Regions:
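Secretory pathway targeting signatures of secreted, lumenal, and periplasmic proteins
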Residues: 28-84
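Solvent-exposed loop and beta-edge segments used for protein-protein assembly and interaction
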Residues: 17-19, 48, 100, 129
Length: 166
């Protein structure tokens, strides 16, 4: 729940997101590892068998129909598995888009091409003057039920307290 997130968050990672993307949001305290490039930030827990990740990315202005493909391209460019040839992708056929409170919510499955990894993701997409801002969370927990994990991650990327700095 958001109440739990308010008391168990990571101020340094939140400041990193605010500086790079202008977004004020709460990041779970366990998310400590990060990778950054110009329009992309990946924050994750360190557990190999219970990985929870948050990606913040900026997309160029594009129609809603192209968002999933654009997100997929950025993920494959920035997130790689243990094998050098493996990269993360969205299973595009699984992606569903709905709109709530002026923000688009994407859900579906992700997979690691070239590796036996995959799982659910949830993302919020907010149109901005420069294009679109994406907050995407995904889980890799092969031995665990993911329903509660994804509820927690959905709270991170989609709640009324996120400020997009507009």
């Amino acid at each position: 729940s958001y109440a739990f997130l308010q008391h168990n968050h990571h101020p340094k990672m939140e400041e990193k997101i605010r500086r790079q993307f202008g977004v004020q949001m709460k990041v779970p305290e366990a998310m400590r590892a990060s990778k950054t490039s110009k329009d992309f930030l990946w924050i994750a827990t360190n557990g190999a068998e219970n990985l929870r990740s948050l990606c913040v990315l900026r997309l160029a202005d594009s129609p809603k129909a192209d968002w999933a493909r654009a997100i997929d391209q950025m993920l494959s460019q920035h997130i790689h598995g243990d094998q050098a040839s493996s990269s993360m992708h969205l299973a595009l056929a699984t992606v569903q888009i709905q709109q709530e409170r002026g923000i688009h919510l994407l859900t579906g499955q992700w997979m690691m091409e070239g590796d036996a990894m995959g799982g659910p993701f949830v993302a919020s997409v907010k149109k901005t003057r420069q294009g679109a801002l994406v907050l995407l969370a995904f889980a890799y927990a092969p031995e665990r039920e993911k329903r509660n994990i994804m509820r927690q991650l959905r709270t991170v990327v989609f709640n009324e307290y996120i400020s997009y700095g507009e």
